[in-house]
Amino acid sequence: MKIAILSRNSKLYSTRRLIEAGRTRGHTVRILDPLRCYMRIAADGFSLHYKGKPITGFDAVIPRIGASVTRYGTAVLRQLEFMGTYTPNPSDAILRSRDKLRAHQLLASQGIDMPVTVFGDNPDDTQDLLSMLGPPPHVVKLNEGAQGAGVILTEKASASRGVVEALRGLYANFIVQEFIGEAEGADLRCFVVGDRVVAAMRRQAADGDFRSNLHLGGTAAMAEASPQEQDVAVRSARALGLAVAGVDLIRSQRGPLVLEVNSTPGLEGVEGVCGVDVAGTIIQHLEQAIR
């Protein structure tokens, strides 16, 4: 099998592990920087070039597209899809996952529970909008933020209004959510491949923070996801059209709540903490999908 990995940095842990896993299983693996890809689109067919040469013959492509190049990266991925290349995470699924509002609407439409979320535009509606959440604390999130960036905890109603008004002044798109205090700064990252959770880890926020992202100083430990949590994680990935996903849940008094579905989840944390060959499992999924 000939596999392409769309990645801007071949030295990143996740990219290196996917290369290693693919080659260990006897496949040809090539890294393509999406920003060096360019394309021809016409009624007589699709073509893709990379550094002056045509790209052909790939059986599968694994997208490792960073948030900063989402639009161009997904355009390249879409071109490969039209050329008949299989991908576990199609371009439209990645775009769904990176639009928090759209993702939450899709999840809610499938009956998947999450923190109550509100979205509005007019400043005259701010007070009523926030009242739909109940009393603070509230969590304000940039709609396309990633890795904990653009996430603000407001502990007073005046602070919630102030942050909302400031973001509107910057013409930023954002959502506001209820704060789940009983989670105590912890979440559960479930790594989904295909139709199952292959690994799970509990992430704990650093002292003084409520965001559990590891690169922000959070810690992680291997965890066991309950059958209900596994079901929610798999359904969440499926709702967005993803076959490979990191689904972040919090454990609440009303059951597991989905915070986010990540279409480009890092492998270093989960493989290091859980001792699971997640990269190999992804390659196995490709093998099964294109038989």
From Swiss-Prot:
Gene3D superfamilies: 3.40.50.20, ATP-grasp fold, A domain, ATP-grasp fold, B domain. It is an enzyme of class 6 (ligase). The keyword Lipid biosynthesis does not apply. Mg(2+) 2 binds at residues 260, 262. One of its GO terms (cellular component) is cytoplasm. Its EC number is 6.3.2.-. Keywords: ATP-binding, Ligase, Magnesium, Manganese, Metal-binding, Nucleotide-binding, Protein biosynthesis. ATP binds at residues 141, 178-179, 187, 211-213. Signal peptide: none annotated. Residues 104-287 form the ATP-grasp domain. The keyword Metal-binding applies. Belongs to the RimK family. This is Probable alpha-L-glutamate ligase. It comes from Xanthomonas campestris pv. campestris (strain ATCC 33913 / DSM 3586 / NCPPB 528 / LMG 568 / P 25).
